[in-house]
């Protein structure tokens, strides 16, 4: 495999590992321009918006993690299938309500695409794909 493809795969592996340890400065550094496009249609564009997304998603699940199942590179895209894990330890905003911590854990299967500009190993967009109700069901909510 070419060097650029290997560097892109490593960038994604590093990005995901840094998310587990909540090293947000280092996660941001994996981007050329931080941007998340969610399956729900929500877009977090720019460092401030992405940091806000990190804070909001980690408040209910401060131990949120991921376990890579498969990773592949094609063109300017890296695709990852992974387990998303976490424990409901903080308030969760769900359907206009705030759900107090249950202490329950979840493990749901997800996928994400990571887009790169031509010739670069810096991410320009992460697009996570998941069933929005999967975590709620796993938590019994």
Show the residue positions of the predicted features.
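C-terminal and inter-domain tail/linker signature
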Residues: 1-141
């Amino acid at each position: 495999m070419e060097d650029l493809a290997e560097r892109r795969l490593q960038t994604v592996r590093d990005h995901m590992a840094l998310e587990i340890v909540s090293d947000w400065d280092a996660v941001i550094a994996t981007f050329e321009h931080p941007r998340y496009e969610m399956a729900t249609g929500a877009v977090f564009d720019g460092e401030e918006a992405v940091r806000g997304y990190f804070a909001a998603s980690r408040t209910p699940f401060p131990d949120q993690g991921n376990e890579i199942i498969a990773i592949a590179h094609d063109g300017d895209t890296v695709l990852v299938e992974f387990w998303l894990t976490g424990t409901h330890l903080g308030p969760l905003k769900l359907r206009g309500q705030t759900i107090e911590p249950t202490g329950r854990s979840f493990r749901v299967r997800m996928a994400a695409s990571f887009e790169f500009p031509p010739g670069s190993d810096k991410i320009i967009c992460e697009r996570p794909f998941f069933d929005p109700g999967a975590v709620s069901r796993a938590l019994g909510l």
